[in-house]
Amino acid sequence: MLHRATTTAAAAAAAALLLCPVQALVRPDGVGKLPALGWNSWNAFGCDIDEEKILTAANQIVNLGLKDLGYEYVNIDDCWSVKSGRNATTGRIMPDLTKFPDGISGLAEKIHNLGLKIGIYSSAGWTTCAGYPASLGNETIDAETFAEWGIDYLKYDNCGVPPDWQDQYSYCVPDSGDPATNPNGTCPNLQNPAPAVYDWRTSKTAERYRRMRDALLGVQDKRTILFSLCDWGQADVNEWGAETGNSWRMSGDISPNWPRISTIANLNSFELNSVDFWGHNDPDMLEVGNGNLTLAENRAHFALWAAMKSPLIIGTALDKIDQDHLSILSNKYLLTFHQDPQIGRPAYPYKWGYNPDWTFDPGHPAEYWSGPTSSGDVLVLMLNTESGPANRTAVWSEVPELKGRNNNNNSSSTGFQVTDAWTGSSLGCVQGGYSVELESHDVAVLVVSGEC
């Protein structure tokens, strides 16, 4: 399996992308089969949350047409509970009633009445990342509580881990963005690495997450709760994430700047063999509309996350979003690919462009991507990773899904009907390939259809 970019040979890497994922966590009602679509409070508000902000987001999902496009989860992140501790009598986590005067159950009812679902946050430790009560050792009672409240989604973080639950070995997550620190996707300065034959399924991290998985499955007769693992890519989660949860973080936190987005996209491009129905790599929540990202960078960020079939969890204040950013989040071509009910695999890089193929480069991830759809169309992305404008060309004979789909042996005269996914405009019958001038960090998204 291609893993953590330690392989640079193109043949070995390409073969790895064809491997089947591990046994997945399959739910009888279909929850978690496709990557999640929704909103989360953290990137927009951090700890400064309350019922009004969550309900505003929920109403905006409806009013802006996002619900009609499939966005359904409204997720409360950290800082929702009483920080001083659990209920001394029941042992349950208590919602902070100054922030949520109707409790979480009351808020859940209001969100459900909008035809949406609600998510909540905890951690596989004693405390959350912000120091609030977490769920390690209390998995059963917390799962029961969440089910009783009407929770539909659990984001489960990796903070507050006590010493006796820490892993025996360290794991390499090469997401520093610094090629000197992580040359070719490695961690040469990693302290206490595991032996090559070590099975990370036996790690304490994997066990902490399995405990909550089992607790959630134990209340499944009352409520199905999507399980989103947030262990930052630690403990080789790609190997056991699909059998434990519905999605799993494959890196550290995102931030609203291009170097961080590029770093995460680069790392995830080497780990896409883990993605299929029921299990999805999570490169973290969307930053579309946040920070000082250019419009081009917002487009590239969303297009890559959608093409990789990552969870698309909006992280901006929806009552303040402008039309340009809303249009990106609402792109029907990318969302159709992302939510394809018959094809679970994501788009894969087929050419690196700026670098030789299979180069691990946080500043210049793969630039050419393609993926199939159940309609027979092919999604093609071209990314400009350079710091200035540059031309990019998708040559049809190089796109894996287009090979063999013509009568001219993939000659330069082969033509396909092409649609620009950003404008929705038909580009007509395009012969041989398509060239476009892209601004720095922008992406072209094409839908390639029948021969012509």
From Swiss-Prot:
The active site is at D157 (nucleophile), D253 (proton donor). Keywords: Disulfide bond, Glycoprotein, Glycosidase, Hydrolase, Secreted, Signal. It holds the Pfam family Melibiase_2. InterPro entries: Aldolase_TIM, Glyco_hydro_27, Glyco_hydro_27/36_CS, Glyco_hydro_b, Glycoside_hydrolase_SF, Melibiase_C. Disulfide bonds join C47-C79, C129-C159. Gene3D superfamilies: Aldolase class I, Golgi alpha-mannosidase II. Its EC number is 3.2.1.22. It is found in: Secreted. One of its GO terms (molecular function) is alpha-galactosidase activity. Substrate binds at D231, W232, G233, Q234, A235. One of its GO terms (cellular component) is extracellular region. Hydrolyzes a variety of simple alpha-D-galactoside as well as more complex molecules such as oligosaccharides and polysaccharides. Belongs to the glycosyl hydrolase 27 family. This is Probable alpha-galactosidase B. It comes from Talaromyces emersonii.
